[in-house]
Amino acid sequence: HIKCPVFVAREWFRHRIGSFNEFSARYSEVPNEFFVPAESDVRTQVGKPGAYRFEPVDAELSRETVELIQKNNEQAYEAYSYMISRGIAKELARAVLPVAMYTQFYWTVNARSLMNFLSLRQHESAQRDIREYANAVYELASPVMPVTFAAWEQNSRIAP
């Protein structure tokens, strides 16, 4: 069972391995839970796609960015809640919700596909947000399959 921002889940679902069963905002009301970065995590992207690096921004811009994200999340949820309270269908009201909203899903995956996912998403070039989740998955899964993970580590983290 995984709970993460929608933008992280969309990266996760790009892996066409295993099966996913996601919480449905079409049939259930969405909780007021959104991702807001820490001020220290606000950075700028320098370079071309695929070959860029991140650099920190000044404290003022960092604070302003976090406030804008928080405000957007709050306004979006207010609009969503208003529509729900007026009887608008959940499947339509959800259209105003941002990708910073948290979602939940169940993920079923075999060991080989799990190791492929980890080798890609724990890599330093992976998006930091999904890398943190991949690290957590590793911490949960490796004690369950210690022999399998030991062989994977000895094979330079290359899935068989």
What are these regions (language model features)?
Residues 1-160:
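Family-specific signature for flavin-dependent thymidylate synthase
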